[in-house]
Swiss-Prot record:
Belongs to the IspF family. It comes from Desulfosudis oleivorans (strain DSM 6200 / JCM 39069 / Hxd3). GO terms for molecular function: 2-C-methyl-D-erythritol 2,4-cyclodiphosphate synthase activity; metal ion binding. Binds 1 divalent metal cation per subunit. Pathway: Isoprenoid biosynthesis; isopentenyl diphosphate biosynthesis via DXP pathway; isopentenyl diphosphate from 1-deoxy-D-xylulose 5-phosphate: step 4/6. The lineage of its organism: Bacteria, Pseudomonadati, Thermodesulfobacteriota, Desulfobacteria, Desulfobacterales. Its cofactor is a divalent metal cation. This is 2-C-methyl-D-erythritol 2,4-cyclodiphosphate synthase. Coiled coil: none annotated. Homotrimer. It catalyses: 4-CDP-2-C-methyl-D-erythritol 2-phosphate = 2-C-methyl-D-erythritol 2,4-cyclic diphosphate + CMP.
Length: 168
């Protein structure tokens, strides 16, 4: 059994689409970044890569690589899942939290979880998404940025339980 954590933060800017968990959200600003800047998916990728001892998102999908310019972060997550499977790991569960002052995300959390589960080929019940504000404090609270953090539990494929939960 292995556990990894992930964290990401991106600045909010005008003129960009806001994407969280692969869901395009109506909002006056979007996250600035090389890919679609989906902080939620980036944090999940980092948690999974860390749990597997495979470094971090920047090692595999650097912002200096033109192949990843504007790409959907769900594609990065799919590739992360492939790397884990190749190393013999099975995703048991993911728990992630988005930190954002606005917009309200409650109505979108299930779709975000479903998108990430689909990208990884796991049951949506194995992915949990939460959202919170920072009560007006820091860059997130001032509406200048959004952040996300995640924890992931993985096991070696041989240890996979008979219920068939997780990846694979």
């Amino acid at each position: 059994m292995r556990i990894g954590t992930g964290y990401d933060l991106h600045r909010l800017v005008k003129g960009r689409r806001l994407v969280l968990g692969g869901v395009a959200l109506p909002f006056e600003k979007g996250l600035d970044g090389h890919s679609d800047a989906d902080v939620l998916v980036h944090a999940v990728c980092d948690a999974l890569l860390g749990a597997a001892g495979l470094g971090d998102i920047g090692d595999h999908f650097p912002d200096t690589d033109a192949r990843f310019k504007g790409v959907s972060s769900l594609l990065l997550l799919t590739e992360t899942g492939r790397m884990l499977k190749e190393k013999g790991f099975f995703v048991v569960n993911i728990d992630a939290t988005v930190l954002a002052q606005a917009p309200k995300l409650g109505a979108h959390k299930a779709a975000m979880a479903a998108n990430m589960a689909t990208a990884l080929g796991i049951d949506a019940a194995c992915v949990n998404v939460k959202a919170t504000t920072t009560e007006g404090l820091d860059a997130v609270g001032r509406g200048e940025a959004m952040a996300a953090m995640s924890v992931a539990l993985i096991i070696e494929e041989e240890a996979r339980d008979s219920r068939g939960q997780g990846a694979g």
